[in-house]
Amino acid sequence: ALSEIAGGRRAIDVALEYGFDTYAGFYKAFVRMYGSSPKKSLYKTEVSVMFTEKELRNILANWDIPQDLPILDIYIMDGSKVSGNVWSVGEEYILKTESDAEYSSNRDSMLKNINIAKTLSAQGFAASIPIPTKSGAEYLDGEKISILTRGIKGNPLAKADRFGDNRRMFGVKYGESIARLHKALAVIEPDIKPQEQNLYTHVTGWALPEVKKQNYQYQMGLPDSFFQDYIDNFGVLFDKLPKQLIHRDPNPSNILFDGGEVSGFIDFDLSERNVRLWDLCYCSTGILCEWRGVDGIHEKWLDILAGILQGYDSVNPLTDEEKQAVYYVICSIQMICVAYFESVGELKELAKTNREMLQFIVEQEAKIKQLSNNL
């Protein structure tokens, strides 16, 4: 939409085409998403590549679907945009295009996503399998590939529900669903042949030294004993942890609910072979990152984490070593996030958020270990 306004079209006309009843509605949604007004954003020197309405229509013409369906950006229920390269088309379809951004999905990961979705579908899981183009291809292959799928019924759980009175119950549902997903992924892993990530060497060889620098630079207050404890104790546990094909990105936006139950998972672009604990812990930190404005965040997040662990363990029992390693895997995720976001200029604010999260997690070490040991 922004590129069309920049091209000289009237803002109200563009807003109406993109499904807003008024320009005011478009303006509010834009500010909520980008943090500034459309006018200010037009003058930014770095604007991500955007598709015009006409360009998206030309892409969709390659599929045998009604060509007058509305095209809208995808938002999770509390208003945050999921991605700049994914759109809903009518009520049934999802269009995804290859992204330019280094930290977004690339061609290989999109094709891997197709493979996993097809294999999960064959296992009886709800999955976004591709709709063939008019020529019978699974995707449109051009300068950028485009994939059209039928959306899985459901929406990400609202923040109000994640942190609400039923947070422990919803935590259990997250954990149970990840456990069922892991059972299916373990079956299909030989067909997918995923790349393997050694979490321990990845953190100790890169992320941990970077966080050490930031600990000094930003006066985070993490003691030297935190880093040494991680190296020593997680080093002993790591080789004993079960590893398999995992989702890798089960943040709340990628887990859909319908009627209060998990209806499916989306976006397997980052899937890899890693410790299976990663998905449980990543789900919990993905929820924690929305902590601002939540009263009693300490107790509420620990309730959610306890629910996730309990739900997973009831379906796919955790080993003793996994229970001991929960805290270290959560810290691994946070150190990776802190190191990565600080290295990308436009994401430094996210680095700050993740530093605060890491500080909070370290403060909660005893409680986190108690939760996992009580399973």
Where do the protein language model's features map onto the residues?
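Terminal helix-turn-helix DNA-binding modules in bacterial transcription factors
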Residues: 1-19, 45-49
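ATP/Mg2+ or Mg2+-diphosphate-binding catalytic cores
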Residues: 336-375
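A cross-family kinase active-site recognition segment
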Residues: 164-221
